[in-house]
C-alpha cells in the first residue's frame, strides 16, 4: 500500500557533536548576521552603521581624553554579569533551573548594604567589603537552599518558585526604598522624599589606582572565581556529581550518589555566588536601587546558554555582551535616533541564531 505522507520541504533539526571549529564558526557567523541585520535597521533610522559600530566596539574611547572612565564603567558592568552567569551555569549543568538570579542579586545587595551601614565607621575598608560579600553570599545561598529543599522534599517546581521570588525580592527592595522611617537605615535622613543614601566610605569598593584608571579589586576576585569554577566542574568529585545528575538523575541514584544532597549543595553555591555579586555591586555603585541588577539575572541566563555552560566560554560571551551593552549606550549619544537598548536587539538575534 502506497504511503501518501508528504515529506516536509524544510526540516529543522538540532545538530549534535559538532567539532569545535564548526561551533566557533557558527558563533562568529551569528555575530556577523546580527550586525548585518542591525546595520539595516540603523540605515532605516538614518544612522551610519560604520560609525555606530565603531563607537560601540571601542566604547567611545578613540580620541577621548576620559577613556579611562569608559573602561571603569565596563568593569562595573562586566563583573556582576560574569559572576551571575558562572553561578547560573552550576545549577543549569545539573538541569536545575535557577531563574531567580534577579531576586538573589537584589537580596544579596540589600544584605551587603546592611553590613555597610551597621559596621563601625572605623572598620577597615577591605574587611568591610569582605563582610558585605559574605553577608550577600549567605542570604543568596539560603534562598537557593530553600528552593532546593522544597524541590527535593515536596517536588516544588524550581522554575516557578525562583521566578516568583524575583518579584518578592523586588517588592522588598521597593519597600525599603519608599518607607520613610527612623529605623530605615538605607535612606537619606536629610531628604524630604524617600531616597537611598550613599553607603559609608569604608563600604565602597577598594580600588587600585593605575594612573588615572581605577581598577576595582572585584575584577581580580572574579577572575580567580573563573579559575575556581573551571577546576570545580572539571577536576573535582563535586563537579563530576553535578554532571552525572544533569545527565540522568536515575543513573546518579543507581550509582549510589546522594542526589538530594548534591542538588541542595549546588543550588546553595549557585545562589550564594549571585548574592555575593549583589553585595559587590552595591559596593561598586555605592548605593542601593531597585534597578541595581541591571537585569544580570536575565542576561546571565543568555550568557550561560550561549557559552554552553563552559566557564571559559562564559568569560568570552560576557565580554562580548558587556561591550554590546556599554558600547550601545556610548554610541547612542552620537546617534540620537538609536535607543541605547539596541544592544538587546543584537543579543536577541545572536541567541535566536545559535539556539
Model region roles, listed by residue range:
Residues 211-287, 311-312:
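Helix-loop-helix "hairpin" substructures at the membrane interface of multi-pass membrane proteins
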Residues 1-33, 39, 247, 254-261, ...:
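Cytosolic-side transmembrane-helix boundaries in multi-pass membrane proteins
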Residues 166-235, 342:
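Transmembrane helix-bundle core of multi-pass membrane transporters
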Residues 268-348:
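Transmembrane alpha-helical segments in multi-pass inner-membrane proteins
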Residues 17-25, 45, 92-100, 124-194, ...:
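Short loop segments and helix-boundary regions at transmembrane helix junctions
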Residues 7-85:
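Membrane-interfacial amphipathic/re-entrant helices at transmembrane-helix boundaries
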Residues 40-47, 64-119, 133, 137-156, ...:
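Single transmembrane alpha-helix segments in multi-pass membrane proteins
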Residues 46-51, 92-109, 152-161, 265, ...:
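Short, non-helical or kinked segments that cap or interrupt transmembrane helices
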Amino acid at each position: 500500500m502506497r504511503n501518501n505522507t508528504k515529506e516536509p520541504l524544510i526540516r529543522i533539526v538540532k545538530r549534535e557533536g559538532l567539532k569545535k571549529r564548526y561551533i566557533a564558526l557558527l558563533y562568529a557567523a551569528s555575530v556577523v548576521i546580527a550586525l548585518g541585520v542591525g546595520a539595516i535597521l540603523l540605515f532605516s533610522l538614518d544612522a551610519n552603521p560604520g560609525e555606530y559600530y565603531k563607537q560601540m566596539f571601542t566604547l567611545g574611547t578613540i580620541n577621548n581624553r576620559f577613556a579611562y572612565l569608559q573602561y571603569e564603567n565596563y568593569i562595573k558592568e562586566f563583573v556582576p554579569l560574569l559572576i551571575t552567569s558562572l553561578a547560573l551555569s552550576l545549577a543549569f549543568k545539573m538541569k536545575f533551573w535557577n531563574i531567580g538570579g534577579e531576586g538573589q542579586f537584589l537580596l544579596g545587595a540589600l544584605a551587603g548594604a546592611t553590613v555597610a551601614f551597621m559596621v563601625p565607621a572605623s572598620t577597615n575598608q577591605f574587611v568591610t567589603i569582605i563582610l558585605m560579600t559574605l553577608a550577600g553570599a549567605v542570604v543568596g545561598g539560603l534562598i537557593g537552599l530553600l528552593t532546593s529543599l522544597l524541590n527535593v522534599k515536596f517536588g516544588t517546581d524550581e522554575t516557578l518558585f525562583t521566578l516568583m521570588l524575583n518579584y518578592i525580592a523586588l517588592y522588598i527592595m521597593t519597600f525599603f526604598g519608599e518607607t520613610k522611617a527612623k529605623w530605615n537605615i538605607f535612606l537619606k535622613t536629610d531628604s524630604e522624599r524617600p531616597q537611598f543614601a550613599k553607603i559609608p566610605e569604608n563600604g565602597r569598593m577598594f580600588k587600585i589606582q593605575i594612573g588615572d584608571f581605577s581598577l576595582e579589586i572585584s575584577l581580580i576576585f572574579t577572575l580567580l572565581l573563573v579559575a575556581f569554577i573551571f577546576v570545580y566542574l572539571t577536576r573535582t568529585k563535586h563537579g563530576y556529581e553535578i554532571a552525572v545528575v544533569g545527565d540522568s538523575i536515575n543513573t546518579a541514584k543507581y550509582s549510589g550518589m546522594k542526589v538530594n544532597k548534591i542538588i541542595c549543595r549546588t543550588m546553595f553555591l549557585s545562589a550564594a555566588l549571585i548574592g555575593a555579586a549583589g553585595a559587590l555591586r552595591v559596593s561598586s555603585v555605592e548605593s542601593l536601587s531597585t534597578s541595581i541588577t541591571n537585569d544580570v539575572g536575565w542576561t546571565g541566563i543568555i550568557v550561560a546558554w550561549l557559552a554552553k555552560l563552559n566557564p571559559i566560554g562564559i568569560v568570552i560571551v560576557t565580554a562580548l555582551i558587556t561591550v554590546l551593552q556599554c558600547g550601545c549606550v556610548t554610541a547612542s549619544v552620537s546617534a540620537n535616533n538609536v535607543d541605547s537598548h539596541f544592544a538587546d536587539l543584537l543579543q536577541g538575534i545572536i541567541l535566536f541564531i545559535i539556539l
